[in-house]
């Protein structure tokens, strides 16, 4: 009886972990104007609950003309809201300087019950962030 119960419990746990939530993956967004500027945001949400963010901007006549900014930390999901957390001791160094603590993003995708032909790209929309230029940023899944 114990063996049967243990086997059922193990199978139940394996099926829980086998179902992916669809949040993890690579997200990207580009803004550009021919010859004047180029801005790119990249976000990678890993299955293990960590993330890496990279912002690159190349602005003509900008000071400095090229800027790279990085951030990393952990993420959690509840319903369709992803919360980003950064640990000051582990996630910050000379390269990773962006503080994503208390940042939240909404996961937006087409509802499976929506049978219309309209196309809705899967994206994250940042709804809260202490980084002012991240607030209200849409970043699309690749």
Label each residue range with its predicted role:
Residues 1-24:
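Bacterial Sec-dependent N-terminal signal peptides
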Residues 19-72, 85-142:
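Lipid interaction determinants
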């Amino acid at each position: 009886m114990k063996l049967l119960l243990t086997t059922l419990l193990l199978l139940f746990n394996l099926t829980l972990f086998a179902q992916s939530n669809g949040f993890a993956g690579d997200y990207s967004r580009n803004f550009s104007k021919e010859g004047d500027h180029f801005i790119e945001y990249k976000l990678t949400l890993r299955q293990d609950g960590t993330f890496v963010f990279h912002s690159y901007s190349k602005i003509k006549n900008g000071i400095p003309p090229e800027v790279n900014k990085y951030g990393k930390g952990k993420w959690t999901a509840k319903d369709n809201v992803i919360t980003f957390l950064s640990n000051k001791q582990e996630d910050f160094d000379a390269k990773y300087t962006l503080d994503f603590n208390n940042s939240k993003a909404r996961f937006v995708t087409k509802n499976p019950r929506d049978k219309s032909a309209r196309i809705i790209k899967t994206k994250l929309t940042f709804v809260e962030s202490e980084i002012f230029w991240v607030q209200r940023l849409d970043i699309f899944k690749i």
